[in-house]
From Swiss-Prot:
Keywords assigned by UniProt, alphabetized: Cell inner membrane, Cell membrane, Membrane, Transmembrane, Transmembrane helix, Transport
GO CC aspect terms: plasma membrane
GO molecular function, one term: xenobiotic transmembrane transporter activity
Membrane topology of the entry: Multi-pass membrane protein
Keyword Manganese part of the UniProt annotation: no
Descriptive protein name: Multidrug resistance protein MdtC
Keyword match Transmembrane: yes
Gene responsible for this protein: mdtC
Amino acid sequence: MKFFALFIYRPVATILLSVAITLCGILGFRMLPVAPLPQVDFPVIMVSASLPGASPETMASSVATPLERSLGRIVGVSEMTSSSSLGSTRIILQFDFDRDINGAARDVQAAINAAQSLLPSGMPSRPTYRKANPSDAPIMILTLTSDTYSQGELYDFASTQLAPTISQIDGVGDVDVGGSSLPAVRVGLNPQALFNQGVSLDDVRTAISNANVRKPQGALEDGTHRWQIQTNDELKTAAEYQPLIIHYNNGGAVRLGDVATVTDSVQDVRNAGMTNAKPAILLMIRKLPEANIIQTVDSIRAKLPELQETIPAAIDLQIAQDRSPTIRASLEEVEQTLIISVALVILVVFLFLRSGRATIIPAVAVPVSLIGTFAAMYLCGFSLNNLSLMALTIATGFVVDDAIVVLENIARHLEAGMKPLQAALQGTREVGFTVLSMSLSLVAVFLPLLLMGGLPGRLLREFAVTLSVAIGISLLVSLTLTPMMCGWMLKASKPREQKRLRGFGRMLVALQQGYGKSLKWVLNHTRLVGVVLLGTIALNIWLYISIPKTFFPEQDTGVLMGGIQADQSISFQAMRGKLQDFMKIIRDDPAVDNVTGFTGGSRVNSGMMFITLKPRDERSETAQQIIDRLRAKLAKEPGANLFLMAVQDIRVGGRQSNASYQYTLLSDDLAALREWEPKIRKKLATLPELADVNSDQQDNGAEMNLVYDRDTMARLGIDVQAANSLLNNAFGQRQISTIYQPMNQYKVVMEVDPRYTQDISALEKMFVINNEGKAIPLSYFAKWQPANAPLSVNHQGLSAASTISFNLPTGKSLSDASAAIDRAMTQLGVPSTVRGSFAGTAQVFQETMNSQVILIIAAIATVYIVLGILYESYVHPLTILSTLPSAGVGALLALELFNAPFSLIALIGIMLLIGIVKKNAIMMVDFALEAQRHGNLTPQEAIFQACLLRFRPIMMTTLAALFDALPLVLSGGDGSELRQPLGITIVGGLVMSQLLTLYTTPVVYLFFDRLRLRFSRKPKQTVTE
């Protein structure tokens, strides 16, 4: 009593306290960062190594394996995967959530250093690492195009000037430059001309290497001067290499131009990038795992004018893709939803109280509680994101509930003629414990979420803490500011209501009277209600088992990502044509705004595409509907597939795949894996629950297998080293010399001119100069035949691995797909030597599925413990918790009705319902106990009176919560796919709960009261608590 009086009778202090809370909240709001979701990125580091010309199997055994053994010993590595292809190896390390990325980077560097002595000596550079996840979609893509500069020159500008500058911006983890390669002098040799002149490829390589040398020459001094010595020992351009003498034949000089075509070109001609059908260089920017995407994008945009000034005017630098506009639009939609929810909740209060003066009180209490929460969010290091803003939206209903309970009870005393200050004090005292019970039990619901580990726990923590803080501040405001305002603002008389609202008042009275009559009937037929209650419990179990489930709602971020997978024997020229064909199909779609893509590099038969869709208000279809429409058109392209998926804000794992979900096959027997992977993939491709099934196992690439006759080689005076060097010189785009420039270093690349390697007969033109100086054709000591060979070799840990990726067809859920895959693996009878497991997001879904029921039970148990402590009773908490089954049925039925799978967002809705619907029972039980203690009423009379007296606040709080969640259901625009499952769950649960709990709660109350009397040692005492 004294606590409440302290604030009621000191209005200035109470107002200033509320002002202080509001000001702190405003300050916190201004400093809060903006993000799509809470920070849930796993720390990921990518290690890259190269050995030009080495086969995938060689890269896997000689480069990947030594690095994996060293890297696998790092503390905190949760997953290690690698992929080795022609000349390159990439190892992805995913660390535990609590692992500091910078500390992990230091350990990675130490592990690379430890493995260095085990790596091949011919590697052009040491392995490097990047603190970025290559499977993440870029947060921004910049393109460089020009009508005057070559692709190599554009790539040089991008990699030398732009990428290093962008990499230094806070939050940027990696800038990947694609679409071409650095400028280079390319030497295309003519095998026949070399044979005619008696010049070997090694002779050419040695001559070029010796002619382009950068060595110190020293200085010359006399008594008074000093001169640095400088020579023309370097060759910079193709024109300077052309006249280089490489050999003498019969006294005549053989120049490089006589036996080769020398051009200013690029290091790797098997690269291509495009934007909207125009050749382009792409800068794909990814953020650090812990970085804020909006802040990083804003920093890049602020730097762009400065970057524009560093490149020539003839080069066009454009933003081809930017993830931030849809994120900002989504957050704006949530903010609008929050404002609408507050307005609707205040409207509900006004309709029930029918007093503008009374309505002002919750209209002040709600903003103070919500704004004050921003200060706590800032102190906790949170951000303004979809989940935290949704928490505030839902908190509006909880916040106003506390104010309603206090306000309605004070208003009831005022209508009975009590003086305002006395009514404020008396009314607050009566419901103070009720408000405390509702708030503490509601916060208790989220305690298991705070203790939940892994990605789901990290994702839900901000939601739970934000909501809990809002409830805590609301509790303080409701017991201080609200009663003070009631005492000083309201009058001791019935409020004057407007004529147009009298009808609503009469309707409410009629509804209350009708409820009283029906309640009397129910209390005389309690067995029927008991059957209904048991039925809802059983229905909950059945609905939960049968409802489709997924991890997170499929988002429409306005960005699509596509992976191209072509025939494994396709040439680069044909692959570039496929890229152009696919880009044209997509660019012609009316919902597409921009298309960029690239192909080439170490994997000639693959490519990537990034598609920006038009804003949501300019298209009628969702991203998934657009994908479904494009899938049919793309399927008509022969010899290649383009797998599209909508970019999501949450992507787990470091695997680069062509679809959203992954299923990984592991085996210590590579032959068994290669035998069973095609069988499993083909089986999964027939399942209706899966779409776009594809695999990263590519072991059917075309290979030309050369077999040396070692005896013949020995007789001819040729060793294997010379023969291998011949092949590398001819076909390996061998980098044989370095050109040093002030801003960068460039290579001299030697190979047989592509004009002479159009078919297999090119091998017949190759020859080696033996130790006697004779030209020996390759065909004299080697035979060759076509064969199959892997284009890539993949590992997970130290086991051979193959990852099957898949998307979900429209109308299918991840639980449907998971169950179908498990059935297929059982039907196939896959041996124990091949192990299958879900990976990435699908793996997290499996883990979440296993913990969902435990989490709900833990929340209910926590609420029971808190209520039991508050009521000093084992029984009354059960009465209060009896409201939950009906809410669960309503929520699950609503999800089924709206065709929405049960996701992590729906789980939040269920947890919220545990907190919301028990409020009705708390208000009934509190007043019933009070009536039994002080009114000398029987349990049936007490609960009946409590139900009627609390009917108005119960209706008010329920409708406030209902109207609070309704904008989430009805919201459209960006991010609505995240908000709708939460709103659907809450609205469905509230509607069903309100219909049933007004009757089941009094029945359960009486049931437990009779049960207690039956087993009580003091049968005359009806209420002991």
